[in-house]
Amino acid sequence: CGSSKSNDDELVVYFVPSRDPKEIQSATAPLADMLKEELAKEGFEFKNIRIEVGTSFEAVGEALESGTAHVGFIPGGTYVLYENGADVALTATRLGLNHDSDNPADWNKAPTENTEKQVAYYRSLVIAGPSEKGQALAKKINNGEKLTADDVKNVTWGLSSNTTSPAGYIYPSLWLQENFGLSLTDLPNKVALDNYATALTQLA
């Protein structure tokens, strides 16, 4: 929840653009009426509840900090950067996956599917694309070989343009540093990914 600077007649709820904003707006359209009804039961009556999708993860954090957003669904990385202007109201869980290994080859043995187990974390996956270089890395991994710093420097990386995105930016940064002693600035070839939903399309 963001700053207390608000019009009591309206509640503004923001989502980060983790996928196509139009898809998020369509999926969350019923949320306004649901919130209005449930909040009224708790004594919070709003004339209008507005659902918005930010232009970036950071834009949602800034909206919370400035008070133009009253509630935001944000990842932990965004919260860390904007915690002075926001308080945690709820934390979410999600369905886990049937693969939960630190060995990347394990993920390639069978399709990844949801399980019924609720988890409070999620993983970031480094996906090798269909290009010759991408498939060479995938073959090396599936053969049980370890990648080298030269391996990862000699390919083009797709990274989230949202620098507070855990899966798209923060976790890959940590992985590169811990495994190869590299930072993102050490990668000579990088392209910005729009969001999670279009990332694989861009990779292809």
Regions found by a protein language model. Give the residues of each.
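Short, well-ordered beta-strand elements
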Residues: 7-24, 48-53, 154-159
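Short, polar/charged alpha-helical segment
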Residues: 13-14, 20-47, 174
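Pocket-lining segment of extracytoplasmic ligand-binding domains
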Residues: 153-204
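Bacterial signal peptide processing site
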Residues: 2-4
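A conserved helix-loop-strand patch within extracytoplasmic ligand-binding domains
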Residues: 94-165
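Short beta-strand and adjacent tight-turn residues that come in two discontinuous sequence segments
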Residues: 74, 91
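Short helices/loops that flank or line small-molecule/ion binding pockets
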Residues: 52-72, 80-86, 195-204
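Extracytoplasmic/secreted envelope proteins and their assembly/folding machinery
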Residues: 28, 32, 36, 61, ...
